[in-house]
């Protein structure tokens, strides 16, 4: 297993979608000119990210940046029509800040996600458009923050919808910079929840249902998560039972997962209770601005954190099934059904734990990040397999990155998996190059994904940037200035990153990828 953010064990929670409107400090900006109010609000937002980012261990999100900040500025009597240049400059500065500020834990940038797309009025539409446009126009090495576009029928999904133009603008930006990614509000698992309540982190964390009545992500957290190494369980099962047929090996592997999951549950509960026992003074920003769905000043931490999720994650479903059955789930119906069976089995367990402990246990399709290579390095010291040669395990339930199956088929194969992973998941389409100028083509894939059951969708492609002249494309030597000083931007686990800073497992995965 891998205990994520171990250095924060029992000290703080993982991630949070801000309840930004509940206690917004309007009085701090009362009486200011429009220009000062605009600059002041965006400076406040940066300060908020910086402060909260050091009170917790993971990402931060705004569920409805466009609507919420249109409401904030309207309350402050700020008119966007006469201040467009100031808004553009302030949003541009915010984007640059997200890339250049490295004060999280004293050394790294912040994991920030803006969810947009549901804009209800012209002001909100302007903010959504400007965020996308300024990100699009920013330098090729600007790859933060993560922007998530919420796709919903009657709002932006179809040509007759009021915000369809914003969807096309978002897809145009994705074709150049891989951002935004897309939260598909009409998919099977999300269609019964109001789109305004839905929000995701760039790392794929999903917080929706709540045993205590606070449906949706706003003001709620993932408290902690632990990932189980599925290939390791398969290797151990085959070693323990070398003569069993594959169907029986599969059942034995599930039994082994169950025993590990019981231990994981104990650790999650221990961490949750220790976090709830912390002094609320360790969370001064949450106290001051009441960003959680409950008021910790009144109820204490446990009554607020109980609305959060405790997630059991998994990695390497594909490799696990390969070890057991000797094949790939995307081209074998029997193995594909076993994949569905395994996901249903794991989800059934987390649902039972939620009932047993009256807490929001969930199943998380883990992003690889630190563990895709780490697990391989550990396992290959104990077992022998050709699977280790590639140097990493495949993220969550994904089709392996060198499968070369068509994009529509990858989407449809993975789509059925999403509904089981109520703690978060994402499907990616791997493209050979940036689909610049083809938003309609990406829109068709978005539509296929919605109908296939995909909850969260991203588009990946290799993006190389010349560090000398800024030319972008796919190359080892710049075609403009002949420089070999190339910066490679890739997405492997959720957020875009520079490939030079990848862990070994992520570097191996990036090199192995083939286009769908």
What annotation goes with each model-predicted range?
Residues 67, 310-323, 344:
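Contiguous, well-ordered alpha-helical segments that form the cores/surfaces of helical PPI scaffolds
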Residues 502-509, 513-515:
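Short, intrinsically disordered terminal segments enriched in charged and Pro/Gly residues
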Residues 1-306, 327-328, 332-492, 497-499, ...:
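Conserved catalytic cores of very large enzyme subunits
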């Amino acid at each position: 297993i891998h205990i994520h953010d171990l250095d924060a064990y029992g000290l703080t929670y993982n991630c949070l979608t801000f309840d930004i409107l509940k206690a917004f400090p309007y009085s701090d900006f009362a009486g200011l000119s429009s220009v000062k109010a605009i600059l002041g609000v965006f400076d406040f937002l940066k300060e908020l990210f910086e402060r909260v980012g050091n009170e917790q261990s993971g990402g931060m999100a705004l569920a409805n940046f466009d609507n919420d900040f249109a409401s904030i500025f309207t309350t402050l009597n700020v008119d966007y029509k006469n201040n467009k240049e100031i808004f553009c400059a302030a949003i541009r500065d915010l984007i640059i800040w997200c890339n250049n500020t490295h004060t999280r834990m004293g050394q790294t940038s912040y994991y920030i996600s803006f969810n947009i797309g549901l804009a209800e009025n012209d002001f909100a539409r302007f903010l959504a458009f400007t965020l996308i446009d300024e990100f699009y126009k920013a330098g090729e090495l600007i790859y933060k923050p993560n922007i998530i576009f919420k796709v919903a029928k009657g709002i932006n999904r179809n040509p007759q919808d009021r915000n369809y133009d914003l969807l096309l603008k978002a897809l145009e930006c994705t074709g150049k910079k891989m951002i935004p990614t897309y939260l598909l509000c009409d998919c099977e698992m999300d269609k019964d929840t109001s789109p305004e309540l839905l929000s995701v982190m760039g790392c794929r964390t999903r917080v929706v249902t709540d045993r205590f009545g606070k449906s949706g992500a706003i003001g709620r957290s993932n408290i902690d998560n632990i990932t189980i190494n599925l290939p390791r369980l398969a290797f151990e099962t085959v070693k323990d039972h070398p003569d069993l047929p594959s169907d029986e090996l599969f059942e034995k592997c599930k039994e082994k997962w169950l025993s590990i999951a019981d231990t994981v549950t104990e650790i999650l509960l221990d961490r949750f209770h220790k976090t709830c026992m912390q002094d609320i003074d360790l969370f001064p920003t949450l106290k001051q601005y009441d960003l959680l769905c409950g008021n910790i000043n009144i109820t204490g931490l446990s009554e607020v954190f109980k609305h959060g999720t405790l997630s059991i994650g998994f990695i390497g479903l594909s490799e696990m099934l390969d070890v057991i059955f000797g094949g790939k789930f995307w081209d074998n119906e029997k193995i594909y059904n076993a994949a569905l069976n395994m996901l249903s089995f794991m989800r059934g367990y987390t649902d039972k734990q939620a009932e047993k402990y009256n807490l929001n246990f969930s199943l998380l399709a883990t992003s690889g990040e630190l563990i895709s290579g780490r697990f391989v390095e550990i396992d290959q010291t104990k077992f022998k397999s050709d699977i280790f040669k590639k140097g990493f395990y495949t993220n969550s339930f994904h089709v392996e990155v060198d499968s070369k199956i068509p994009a529509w088929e990858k989407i449809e194969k993975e789509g059925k998996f999403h509904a089981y992973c109520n703690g978060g998941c994402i499907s990616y389409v791997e493209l050979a190059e940036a689909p610049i100028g083809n938003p309609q083509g990406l829109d068709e894939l978005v539509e296929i994904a919605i109908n296939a059951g995909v909850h969260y969708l991203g588009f990946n492609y290799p993006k190389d940037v010349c560090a000398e002249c800024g030319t972008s494309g796919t190359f080892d030597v710049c075609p403009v200035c002949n420089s070999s000083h190339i910066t490679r931007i890739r997405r492997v686990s959720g957020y875009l990153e520079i490939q030079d800073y990848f862990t070994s497992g992520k570097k191996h995965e990036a090199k192995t990828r083939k286009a769908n």
